[in-house]
Amino acid sequence: MKNFAIIGVGGYVAPRHLKAIHETGNNLIAAYDTSDSVGVLDSYFPATSFFTEMELFDRHCTKAKNRGERLDYVSICTPNYLHDAHTRYALRLGSDVICEKPLVLNPWNLDGLQQVEEQTGHTVNNI
């Protein structure tokens, strides 16, 4: 069983991620979106901690990691222009990443992401 977090849980693609995480028997420990999407989230993971502020989401995930809890994957379901920043954040948090297409808007940003992968030892999976 893997532990997941999701960034952009209020987006139109997020329910597919929630469904996949749920149907494969994994846990969702935290979810973030700038708008309240608890109705969708609650249909799959009613006990998941939900945040509308990135700072609080980050604090929650960091504290969980410091307690020895694994955060295996972060799913990125935000608007395209945020994928690069959120992917870098998740890698630096110490998690592998599942990110919707496109991974970056500008191809030259791929080299930077690859460097962060190498620095952290974690990987990005683009779907």
Walk through the language-model features, giving the residues of each.
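N-terminal Rossmann-like dinucleotide-binding module
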Residues: M1-P46, E69
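Conserved hydrophobic packing residues within short motifs/helices of P-loop NTPase cores
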Residues: A5-I7, I98, N125
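General small-molecule cofactor/ligand-binding pocket signal
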Residues: I29, F51, N125
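Short, Asp-centered acidic motifs that coordinate Mg2+ and/or phosphate
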Residues: A30, D72-Y73, T123
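Short, structurally constrained coil/turn elements
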Residues: Y44, R67, E118-T120
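Beta-loop-alpha module in the N-terminal Rossmann-like domain of NAD(P)-dependent dehydrogenases
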Residues: S49-V116
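Rossmann-fold dehydrogenase core element
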Residues: G112-I127
